[in-house]
């Protein structure tokens, strides 16, 4: 025996040595997914990715410190094979010896983690059912007996005393134990999935019964599992009480049980695996039992449901595996014994019996394990002590555990060291029979927690088997939580359902927890308590049912039973969630509160800890920061699963309630015994107090309405969307929980501060969800099913319409009143959530970090979200949902405002309440504005907790105004019903604006609503436009700053623009905006864009009055503006067409019709304009230095716009609050100096630019006033003012654009804005002048100056509506004055530019220099074409001031040159479409104002503007045309349509730009001038044709132009691809290329090719890629991640000799004849400040095929000649057969196709025609079966070659001989034997 033992040891030593060799140096685990670095070191893929993700720049190899990049990592298949073989050997060794190879590793996770994990992974994987499922199935069946026998042997061998146990359990248990952990349990779970589901139903039923009976008899089916859980709980209790004592105690009382289980669990717990171990054991036992019973199924279901959770449980199991091996033997034997016993008592007895057995083996084996565990525990304790994050995490898990008291007990051990009181909790939990159930569910929760703890302790727990890294794991947990929760619910029975809810909460918490573990911990704690309460309530019956409804949907069996109980409540919830729910929820709430109270009394310390954590977080949290962090992750999570993101929100919300929960808990603690409604009432009172404290006016009632509605809506979604069901179920469960908690909002509020807060947080989430549900439900539904979408839409519409009255769309008034109450409550909750978020944010990171990260994340998210939102009808809703989440805090704030307004409006009536609720929805976006307004820029920064409260209060006060607005806006509100998500939001905001503006605007709004009936979107746009125009006027004057600030806060990019502005307050607001999230930002941006557009068009009639009123009602205006912006954004988002509207708005806020048309037409149009908008933003980002934000151009655009508005908002706030001026000295002083004179309206619009422009503004104002006096005679003051307003808004958007788009865009905007304001012309002159004079600052200053100029113009226009037209002329006349003022502004801007980042400055400087150079070239070109334009321009000038026009043309020419240059340089060229459109629209507006009367000849200003616009359009559009002629045309058409008569000349210009406006091209002279300007462009060549079109357009009536606009939009939609590509120049150059290909010559001087350039980069490091990105932005080059037909350049990482590695993009670039150039081309071009000739940097060779084979050059030259004969694969039919590594088959086929071959999908499809030669391409090493490809040639009679033949041929661009690449074929017959050689 000794000898054999020695031999075994020798073998084990060898295996250990091999294992160590194959271990990852980082995680010390066996490398499952090996990746090798350039330095030939091998690591886990997880480890390396985690390492690389930790730093922004290149990371260093842990071993050799060489730089590592993701691109440099290569998968090592050989190494993975070694690992697999080693695992097989180890497995065989274990089977042969009966010893567990990883025993020692079980005790020391770190020492031998890899082997243990390998083995455990196998078992876990099998149990997981994710990987190697087939293997597991194959292995588990044959291995089960051997495993069982080996286990029995192993158990007997391993356990001296265990042998007794083993004897008792060996027969069933040994097998089942190992099998459970091994493949069998997972196998069984998989195999028994059906039976599990049945079992789940039964089990859940049982568990439901057991819930009631849990204490008495936890259902016999569940009894085994529960008994196991209870025993484990007992173990945990004892262990929790005293880990050491427990071990000793366990030995004494139940030596084996406690030592075996308790010790192992305790030891595991420190690692966070204790819960897992226990859960595994319980699961295993239950599995074993289940094998014999339904419990097995249930346990398996647990495994299934936990399988996602198993990812975690496996992780914990890996940590536990050490223990688990022992546990497997010991605990599993225990469980087996229990199985034999079948009864808890029996099981307990068995367990008791087991402990003695386990003692000796356990003790003998556990000593190192115990030591390790104790050390781990200490570390955990230290972590928890040092950082409450762990505590909160643990607490979080513990909270769920508290809910599942057993789980708490299990997890408490982690806390035990930390808190002495935890043991008490544990004891209580353990004592609670339900704890067993809870324990199981909590184990799932705890498992992830354990993983988190381990991660915290060890920094990384690389659990590939866990299926996801933490973040994805969290998401998975959320999704899985939903998916797994279903099985888990079945599994856990009522407890599982509770656990599921807990898990969901945990899951929902997990994403945030992952983001912010501390907060997560806190959030889970309260939510879990809520869940606990809910669970208990569920136990009570209806609450359980309701809470379990979501799970019930998943776990149909339980769902049925639960639904029986829950159906009434659920139906009530779905129907009138408030009323019906309120009563049941009252009991439920009381039950929940009782439970909460009991839980608080049970675990007061934990609650206190949670409270502490939450309190700390609350204090620390800063709303902005939190927003930043949460929205990105949240967005991502949302993208993955709405429920997850919503869960995250809930988590945040829950966290906030945690603070309140402290008080509530205190109250509950006082009333621990009283779990009755009495406790609920005190809790309610406490909640009310808390709510009242946070939002005195916002009684807790309102939120409930939201919640109830939300939950009801989400539930329908669940029912509707099975696919979404899980995620949505999670949402709905959360929502249901929320509903449960909110059903009796008052009770919830009253129920327990904690309960309410938790619920409130849930409710807040709910509210966010309400928006989400309103919109998000639609989104999720739309995501899943059209039916669901419709239902969701109905729900969301109802909810949107009845945001407050959401509870019952049928009961708008009742719902409103209830909702008002509920909303108030909900409002408090949102505030809490906001506070929570703020706290979390503060806790998590510093503002700067958060800003940067959150902005990036949010940009990414918003980028995706905005696209997704706009992509699909649901997407806008999704945007709304995003807005809700982002608004999360603000949404919560918004609910507050809504609540306030709603409550106030309650008196007003249902309509107002509806509006209010719409506002509430809007207030997510709008409230931030209100809050911002209330807070003012500085306060807004404080928007976090206190700010929120203040905002709430101020909102409440302002709510009155809001109410009025709402009342006025009621019609709009109703229209929003038509367009519920958008209009309501926008309407609410608009209502605010309207109230301030006047009833005129309301009338307009009313009309808009009517129009909305016909065109909801358009109406919404109009309504929003009207209100927005009014708001903007008033906002521009007074509230503009606030609204801008709100926009800023709404838009993430506002921060950057604010940074440019240099306003710390704005920055904070920007941060807040970022916090709100990309979607919200996108929506805000859209809303901002849209509102301006709408406002512009609407402001025509009410501009003056609103301005005056706004001045009078500055604060109201601010609120209105804030709300308005948000609503517009929201409406934009809800309405996908708004996307195009956005771009139109972005381009020029004037085109309300355009927006409407866009909305009408076109989702394509919206995409187009959205992209355009993005382009503009991108340009601005380039200029402004928003490069970091450039990731999402649309976000940038919106951000830039929003941020400008945000600045304005700040300014308006500053105006409202003079103290603000001091806060924002540069901007405020600049703005105030002039802006103060101007209406706040101009301030809001011009706030950003106003700073630098204030002086310029004064000059411009003077000149404009002079001009205005002239023009005012021509144009009716009303029209002028209106148009001026529009133009102002256009300028606002323009200024936003200009700041976004950079100087060029500014020029464009200025030019366009000059239509209304000749100021823009001077601005362009100034820009040009500055570009000439101010190389460095000019770009920035130009941007700022342009913005400023625009803004001054806007400001001037605001006070001087009539002057706006004159100001155009005056500005044109005083263009040089403007330049002077611009130079002054530049000096100011220089101060602002100081705010700009160095990178931004450099970029602007570079752009400026390039613009200057290109401008000279363009001027030359323009001069050539000027004769033509001058010919037509004289006619134009003849109509207006010819000198001005001439001047303008000159200015425009230079400006156009600059614009062209800039356009070519930056995405502005793309944006120019939108910009030009905006400008054109503005032009149209200005021309309208100038021509107040259609019959009037366009005033010289408008003409000059048109000329300017043409010039700009010509230059920009030229670039645009080059890039995207259609989009320019579309834009032109849009502008002309919008501006119609007034914009005839503009339309002509636009028409000139695009044929789209041909019907509109009536203004022949304008057209001619425009055409002559555009004559350079091919499209502009038909100047006469365009002129006729333009003339037609000018003659067209407004309605006609509007009709044309839709047509244009349609055309635009048709061309949307091009327009979109242009709009998103960064990402899309296809249309640009295609369009630009036509007109490169126009910008030939500026390198028309630039317009067409679309780059992809390959092999670059992140730093290098950022430089390429900067280069692309600077030169307006599209930079994409994937190569496409539009791609023109492939940037390769090369050495000094231009030799590169071979990559897929490299091959595709060569195959497509692209420019394959070295990265040095970019670096040198940047140094030279121009785009260098690619020939000198073309890649010459690669490391495989030769260093100078010139393949790329050959390929390009052959492509240039477009000679198909020169294609290397011409005449070949190639079939890419079988799997390929490192590239998709379609990419390989595309590569082959690009080289002239005909692609055949299957070898049997070869045509075998003459002149064609078939070839089969395979990759032998990618085939799993060696013989799979050897007979292919026989089937098709074609030569079979390796993929290398294709790659070598493509790389060299020379068809290689097949002989060296042929694969020998196995002849089927002698005759066929020669075929392979063919």
Curated annotation (Swiss-Prot):
Record's compositionally biased regions (Basic residues): 603-614
Phosphoserine modified-residue sites: 114, 392, 395, 420, 431, 692, 712, 751, 987, 1008, 1144, 1190, 1192, 1212, 1218-1219, 1281, 1331, 1344, 1391, 1427, 1460, 1527, 1545
Domain of life: Eukaryota
Keywords recorded for this protein, A-Z: Acetylation, Activator, Cell cycle, Chromosome, Cytoplasm, DNA damage, DNA recombination, DNA repair, DNA-binding, Fatty acid biosynthesis, Fatty acid metabolism, Isopeptide bond, Lipid biosynthesis, Lipid metabolism, Metal-binding, Nucleus, Phosphoprotein, Repeat, Transcription, Transcription regulation, Transferase, Tumor suppressor, Ubl conjugation, Ubl conjugation pathway, Zinc, Zinc-finger
Biased composition (Low complexity): 590-601
Compositional bias of kind Basic and acidic residues: 349-365, 559-582, 1329-1343, 1754-1764
Stretches annotated zinc finger (RING-type): 24-65
SMART domains: BRCT, RING
Modified residues (N-acetylmethionine): 1
Post-translational modification: Phosphorylated in response to IR, UV, and various stimuli that cause checkpoint activation, probably by ATM or ATR. Phosphorylation at Ser-987 by CHEK2 regulates mitotic spindle assembly. Phosphorylation by AURKA regulates centrosomal microtubule nucleation. Autoubiquitinated, undergoes 'Lys-6'-linked polyubiquitination. 'Lys-6'-linked polyubiquitination does not promote degradation.
GO CC field: BRCA1-A complex; BRCA1-BARD1 complex; chromosome; cytoplasm; nucleus
PTM sites of type Phosphothreonine: 1398
Ranges of biased composition (kind: Polar residues): 303-318, 1138-1148, 1183-1194, 1315-1325, 1377-1401, 1465-1491
Major subcellular location class: nucleus
Stretches assigned to the BRCT domain: 1652-1739, 1764-1863
E.C. no: 2.3.2.27
Catalytic activity line of the entry: S-ubiquitinyl-[E2 ubiquitin-conjugating enzyme]-L-cysteine + [acceptor protein]-L-lysine = [E2 ubiquitin-conjugating enzyme]-L-cysteine + N(6)-ubiquitinyl-[acceptor protein]-L-lysine
PANTHER family noted in UniProt: BREAST CANCER TYPE 1 SUSCEPTIBILITY PROTEIN (PTHR13763:SF0), BREAST CANCER TYPE 1 SUSCEPTIBILITY PROTEIN BRCA1 (PTHR13763)
Oligomeric and partner information: Heterodimer with BARD1. Part of the BRCA1-associated genome surveillance complex (BASC), which contains BRCA1, MSH2, MSH6, MLH1, ATM, BLM, PMS2 and the MRE11-RAD50-NBN protein (MRN) complex. This association could be a dynamic process changing throughout the cell cycle and within subnuclear domains. Component of the BRCA1-A complex, at least composed of BRCA1, BARD1, UIMC1/RAP80, ABRAXAS1, BRCC3/BRCC36, BABAM2 and BABAM1/NBA1. Interacts (via the BRCT domains) with ABRAXAS1 (phosphorylated form); this is important for recruitment to sites of DNA damage.
Record protein name field: Breast cancer type 1 susceptibility protein homolog
Organism of derivation: Canis lupus familiaris (Dog)
């Amino acid at each position: 025996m000794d000898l054999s033992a020695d031999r075994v040891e020798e073998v084990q030593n060898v295996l250990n040595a091999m294992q160590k060799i194959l271990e990852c140096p980082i995680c010390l685990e066996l490398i499952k997914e090996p990746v090798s670095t350039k330095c030939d070191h091998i690591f886990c893929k997880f480890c390396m990715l985690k390492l690389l993700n930790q730093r922004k720049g290149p990371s260093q190899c842990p071993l050799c410190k060489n730089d590592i990049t993701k691109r440099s990592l290569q998968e090592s298949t050989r190494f993975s094979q070694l690992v697999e073989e080693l695992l097989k050997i180890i497995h065989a060794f274990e089977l042969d010896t009966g010893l567990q190879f990883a025993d020692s590793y079980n005790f020391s996770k770190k020492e031998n983690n890899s082997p243990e994990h390998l083995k455990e992974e196998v078992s876990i994987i099998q149990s997981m059912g994710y990987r190697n499922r087939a293997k597991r199935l194959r292995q588990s069946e044959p291995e089960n007996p051997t495993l069982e026998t080996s286990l029995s042997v192993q158990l007997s061998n391993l356990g001296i005393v265990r042998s007794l146990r083993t004897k008792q359990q060996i027969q069933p248990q040994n097998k089942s134990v190992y099998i459970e952990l091994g493949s069998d349990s997972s196998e069984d779970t998989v195999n028994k999935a059906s039976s599990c589901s049945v079992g789940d139903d039964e089990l859940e039923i049982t568990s439901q019964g057991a819930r009631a009976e849990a204490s008495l008899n936890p259902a016999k089916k569940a009894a085994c599992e529960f008994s196991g859980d209870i025993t484990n709980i007992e173990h945990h209790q004892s262990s929790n009480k005293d880990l050491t004592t427990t071990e000793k105690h366990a030995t004494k009382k139940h030596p084996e049980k406690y030592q075996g289980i308790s010790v192992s669990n305790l030891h595991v717990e420190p690692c966070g695996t204790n819960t897992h171990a226990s859960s595994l054991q319980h699961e295993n036992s239950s599995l074993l039992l289940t094998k014999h019973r339904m419990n097995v199924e249930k346990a398996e279901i647990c495994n299934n449901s936990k399988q996602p959770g198993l990812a975690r449980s496996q992780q914990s199991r890996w940590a536990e595996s050490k223990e688990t091996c022992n546990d497997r033997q010991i605990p599993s034997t225990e469980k087996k014994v229990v199985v034999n016993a079948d009864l808890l008592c029996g099981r307990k007895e068995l367990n008791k019996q087991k402990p003695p057995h386990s003692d000796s083996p356990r003790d003998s084996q556990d000593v190192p394990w115990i030591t390790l565990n104790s050390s781990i525990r200490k570390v955990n304790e230290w972590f928890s002590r040092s950082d409450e994050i762990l505590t909160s995490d643990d607490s979080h898990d513990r909270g769920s555990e508290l809910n599942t008291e057993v789980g708490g007990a299990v997890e408490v051990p982690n806390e035990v060291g930390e808190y002495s009181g935890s043991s008490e909790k544990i004891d209580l939990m353990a004592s609670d029979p339900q704890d067993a159930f809870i324990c199981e569910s909590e184990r799932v929760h705890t498992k992830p927690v354990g993983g988190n703890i381990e991660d915290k302790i060890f920094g990384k727990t690389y659990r590939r088997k866990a299926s996801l890294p933490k973040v994805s794991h969290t998401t998975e947990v959320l999704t899985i939580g939903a998916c797994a929760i279903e099985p888990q619910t079945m599994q856990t029975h009522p407890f599982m359902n509770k656990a599921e809810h807990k898990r969901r909460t945990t899951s929902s918490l997990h994403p945030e927890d992952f983001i912010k573990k501390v907060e997560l911990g806190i959030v889970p704690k309260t939510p879990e308590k809520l869940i606990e309460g809910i669970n208990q309530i569920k136990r009570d019956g209806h609450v359980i049912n309701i809470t379990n409804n979501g799970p019930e949907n998943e776990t149909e069996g339980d769902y049925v039973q639960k639904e029986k109980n829950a159906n009434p409540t659920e139906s009530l919830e779905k129907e009138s969630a408030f009323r019906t729910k309120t009563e049941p929820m009252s009991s439920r709430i009381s039950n929940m509160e009782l439970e909460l109270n009991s839980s608080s009394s049970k675990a007061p310390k934990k609650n206190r800890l949670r409270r502490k954590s939450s309190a700390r977080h609350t204090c620390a949290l800063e709303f902005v920061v939190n927003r930043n962090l949460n929205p990105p992750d949240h967005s991502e999570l949302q993208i993955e699963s709405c429920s997850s993101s919503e869960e995250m929100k809930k988590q945040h919300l829950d966290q906030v309630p945690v603070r309140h929960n402290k008080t509530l808990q205190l109250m509950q603690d006082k009333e621990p015994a009283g779990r009755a409604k009495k406790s609920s009432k005190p809790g309610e009172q406490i909640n009310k107090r808390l709510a009242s404290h946070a939002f005195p006016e916002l009684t807790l009632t309102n939120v409930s309405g939201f919640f109830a509605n939300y939950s009801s809506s989400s539930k329908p979604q669940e029912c509707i969307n099975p696919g979404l069901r899980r995620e949505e179920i999670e949402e709905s469960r959360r929502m249901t929980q929320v509903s449960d908690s909110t059903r009796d909002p008052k009770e919830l509020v009253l129920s327990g501060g904690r309960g309410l807060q938790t619920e409130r947080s849930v409710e807040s989430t709910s509210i966010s969800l309400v928006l989400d549900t309103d919109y998000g439900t639609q989104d999720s539904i739309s995501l899943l099913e059209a039916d669901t979408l419709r239902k969701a839409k109905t729900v969301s519409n109802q909810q949107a319409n009845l945001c407050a009255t959401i509870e019952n769309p049928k009961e708008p008034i009742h719902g409103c009143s209830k909702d008002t109450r509920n909303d108030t409550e909900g409002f408090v909750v949102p505030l809490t959530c906001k506070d929570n978020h703020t706290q979390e944010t503060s806790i998590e990171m510093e503002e700067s970090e958060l800003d940067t990260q959150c902005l990036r994340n949010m940009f990414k998210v918003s980028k995706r979200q905005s696209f997704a939102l706009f992509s699909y009808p649901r997407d806008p809703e999704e945007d709304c949902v995003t807005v809700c989440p982002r608004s999360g805090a603000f949404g919560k704030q918004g609910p507050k405002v809504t609540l306030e307004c709603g409550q106030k409006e309650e008196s007003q009536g249902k309509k107002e309440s509806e509006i209010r609720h719409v506002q509430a929805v809007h207030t997510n976006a709008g409230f931030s504005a209100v809050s911002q307004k209330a807070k003012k820029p500085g306060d807004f920064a404080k928007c976090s907790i206190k700010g929120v409260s203040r905002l709430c209060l101020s909102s409440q006060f302002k709510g009155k105004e809001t109410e009025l607005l709402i009342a006025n806006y009621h019609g709009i509100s109703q229209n929003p019903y038509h367009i519920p998500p958008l209009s309501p939001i926008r309407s609410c905001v608009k209502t605010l604006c309207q109230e301030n503006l006047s009833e005129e605007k309301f009338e307009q709004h009313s009309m808009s609503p009517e129009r909305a009936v016909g065109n909801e979107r358009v109406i919404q746009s109009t309504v929003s436009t009207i209100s927005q125009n009014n708001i903007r006027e008033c906002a521009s004057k007074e509230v503009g700053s606030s609204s801008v600030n709100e926009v800023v806060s709404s838009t993430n990019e506002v921060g950057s623009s604010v940074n440019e502005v240099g306003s710390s307050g704005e920055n904070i607001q920007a941060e807040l905006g970022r916090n709100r999230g990309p979607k919200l930002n996108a929506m805000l941006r859209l809303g901002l864009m849209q509102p301006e557009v709408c406002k512009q068009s609407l402001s025509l009639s009410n501009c003056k009055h609103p301005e005056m009123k706004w001045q009078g009602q500055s604060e109201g205006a601010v609120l209105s503006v804030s709300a308005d912006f948000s609503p517009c954004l929201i409406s934009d988002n809800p309405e996908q067409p708004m996307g195009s509207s956005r771009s139109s708005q972005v381009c020029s806020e004037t085109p309300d019709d355009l927006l409407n048309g866009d909305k009408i037409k076109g989702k394509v149009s919206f995409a187009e304009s959205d992209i355009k908008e993005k382009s503009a933003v991108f340009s601005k980002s380039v200029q402004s230095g928003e490069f970091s934000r450039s990731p999402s151009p649309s976000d940038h655009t919106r951000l830039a716009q929003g941020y400008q508005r945000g600045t304005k908002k700040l300014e308006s706030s500053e105006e409202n609050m003079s103290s603000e001026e001091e806060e924002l000295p540069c901007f405020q002083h600049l703005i105030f100096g002039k802006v103060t004179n101007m209406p706040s309206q101009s301030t809001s619009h011009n706030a950003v630019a106003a700073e630098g422009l204030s002086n310029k503004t004064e000059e411009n104002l003077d000149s404009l006033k002079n001009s205005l006096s002239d023009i005012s005679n021509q144009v009716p003051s009303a029209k002028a003012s209106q148009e001026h307003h529009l133009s102002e808004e256009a300028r606002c958007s323009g200024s936003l654009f200009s700041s976004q788009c950079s100087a060029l865009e500014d020029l464009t905007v200025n030019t366009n804005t000059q239509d209304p304001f000749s100021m823009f012309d001077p601005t362009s002159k100034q820009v040009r002048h500055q570009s000439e004079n101010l190389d460095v600052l000019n770009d920035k200053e130009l941007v700022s100056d342009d913005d400023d100029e625009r803004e001054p113009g806007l400001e001037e226009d605001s006070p001087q509506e009539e002057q706006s037209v004159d100001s155009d002329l005056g500005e044109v006349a005083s263009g040089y004055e403007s330049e002077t003022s611009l130079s002054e502004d530049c000096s100011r801007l220089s101060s602002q530019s100081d705010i700009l980042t160095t990178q931004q400055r450099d970029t602007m400087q570079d752009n400026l220099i390039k613009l200057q150079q290109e401008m000279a070239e363009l001027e030359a070109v323009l001069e050539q074409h000027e004769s033509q334009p001058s010919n037509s321009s004289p006619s134009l000038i003849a109509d207006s001031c010819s000198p001005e026009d001439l001047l303008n043309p000159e200015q425009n020419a230079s400006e156009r040159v600059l614009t062209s240059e800039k356009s070519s340089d930056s995405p502005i060229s793309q944006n120019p479409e939108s910009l030009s459109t905006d400008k054109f629209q503005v032009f149209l507006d200005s021309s309208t104002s100038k021509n107040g009367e259609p019959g009037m000849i366009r005033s010289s200003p408008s003409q000059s503007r048109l000329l300017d616009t043409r010039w700009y359009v010509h230059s920009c559009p030229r670039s645009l045309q080059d890039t995207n002629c259609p989009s320019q045309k579309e834009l032109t058409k849009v502008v002309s349509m919008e501006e119609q008569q007034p914009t005839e000349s503009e339309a002509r210009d636009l028409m000139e730009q695009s044929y789209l406006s041909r019907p509109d091209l009536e203004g022949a002279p304008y057209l001619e001038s425009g055409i002559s300007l555009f004559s350079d462009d091919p499209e502009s060549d038909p100047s006469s044709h365009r002129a006729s079109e333009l003339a037609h357009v000018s003659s067209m009536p407004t309605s006609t132009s509007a009709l044309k606009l839709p047509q244009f939009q349609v055309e635009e939609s048709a061309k949307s691809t091009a327009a979109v590509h242009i709009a998103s120049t960064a990402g899309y150059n296809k249309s640009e290329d295609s369009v630009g290909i036509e007109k490169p010559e126009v910008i030939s001087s500026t390198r028309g090719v630039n317009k067409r350039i679309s780059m992809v980069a390959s092999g670059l490091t992140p730093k290098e890629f950022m430089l390429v990105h900067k280069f692309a932005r600077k030169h307006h080059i599209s930079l994409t991640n994937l190569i496409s037909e539009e791609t023109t350049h492939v940037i390769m990482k090369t050495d000094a000799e231009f030799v590169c590695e071979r990559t897929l993009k490299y091959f595709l670039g060569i195959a497509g004849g692209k420019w394959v150039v070295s990265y040095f081309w970019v670096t040198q071009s940047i140094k030279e400040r121009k785009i260098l000739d690619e020939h000198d940097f073309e890649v010459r060779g690669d490391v495989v095929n030769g260093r100078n084979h010139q393949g790329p050059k050959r390929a390009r030259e052959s492509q240039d000649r477009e000679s198909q004969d020169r294609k290397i694969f011409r005449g070949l039919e190639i079939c890419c057969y079988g799997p390929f590594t490192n590239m998709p088959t379609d990419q390989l086929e595309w590569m082959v196709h690009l080289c002239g071959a005909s692609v055949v999908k299957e070898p049997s499809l070869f045509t075998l025609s003459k002149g064609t030669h078939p070839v089969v391409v395979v990759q032998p090493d990618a085939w799993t079966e060696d013989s799979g490809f050897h007979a292919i040639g026989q089937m098709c009679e074609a030569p079979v070659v390796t993929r290398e033949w294709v790659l070598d041929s493509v790389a060299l661009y020379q068809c290689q001989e097949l002989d060296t690449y042929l694969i020998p074929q196995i002849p089927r017959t002698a005759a066929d034997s020669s075929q392979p050689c063919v």
